[in-house]
């Protein structure tokens, strides 16, 4: 065998070493995504922590179900902060450290994608609730959601790196998935299974107050933040490699950022 495929592991290793400090950024983003659904569920239902951990719908679904302006405002702030920081994080993966998007257009594009993902997640949560005790229907919803996430796996990276809109990014994400089918599927499956295992372990062991559960939740955020960081690096390298080898058209317009990897 010859060609760029031989250099992919080395490229991933090089980026992981050069960008290792970004693991703390990834942990912060994971902690935000972990804490917000729990907080919105508490604002909606005021249940004990153990119950909230076992049954979180997400801030958008909670805001609609509760018809609460407070939860809606909470969701909007989360969405704005999350998109802002996510853009800075992706820019940092392919260039110097950033905490913010490159410009307003990039921010709005990423915000639109994040909103779409939240809407799909909320619809899936409601569908699972409607499925009730029918495991076949619930599993079908989960499988459909997993397929959707597989299609858009690279979309946020592409918005930032290739400077395109969300619809174009989804189309390019699908092309990237097709060009890197096996590694993309393995990464999504690994992150999903590890995340589910971590959540399941937390659900089984959290029975007390927030103060008693906090250390275990922090450990989960640190471990899964590290896992997500590694997955992000691999996915970014896979996307750039697919673009640079001509398997995607058009090539990323901001190719200068990609050369840093």
Regions found by a protein language model. Give the residues of each.
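Hydrophobic alpha-helical membrane segments
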Residues: 1-261
């Amino acid at each position: 065998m010859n060609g760029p495929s031989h250099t992919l592991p080395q490229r991933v290793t090089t980026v992981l070493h050069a960008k290792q400090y970004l693991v703390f950024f990834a942990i912060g983003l994971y902690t935000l995504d972990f804490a917000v659904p729990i907080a919105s569920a508490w604002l909606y239902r005021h249940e004990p922590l153990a119950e909230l951990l076992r049954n979180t719908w997400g801030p958008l679904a909670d805001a609609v179900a509760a018809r609460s302006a407070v939860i809606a405002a909470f969701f909007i702030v989360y969405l704005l902060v999350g998109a802002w920081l996510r853009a800075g994080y992706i820019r940092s993966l392919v260039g110097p450290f950033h905490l913010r998007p490159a410009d307003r257009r990039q921010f709005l594009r990423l915000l639109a994608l994040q909103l779409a993902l939240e809407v799909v997640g909320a619809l899936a949560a409601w569908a699972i609730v409607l499925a009730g005790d029918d495991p076949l229907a619930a599993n079908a919803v989960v499988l459909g959601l997993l397929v959707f996430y597989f299609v858009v796996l690279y979309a946020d990276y592409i918005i930032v790196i290739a400077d395109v809109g969300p619809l174009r990014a989804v189309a390019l994400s699908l092309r990237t998935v097709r060009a890197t089918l096996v590694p993309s599927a393995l990464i999504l499956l690994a992150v999903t299974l590890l995340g589910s295992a971590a959540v399941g372990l937390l659900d089984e062991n959290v029975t007390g107050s927030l103060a008693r559960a906090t250390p275990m939740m922090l450990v989960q955020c640190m471990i899964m933040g590290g896992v997500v960081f590694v997955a992000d690096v691999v996915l970014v390298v896979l996307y750039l490699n697919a673009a640079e080898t001509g398997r995607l058209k058009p090539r990323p317009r901001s190719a200068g950022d990609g050369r840093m990897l």
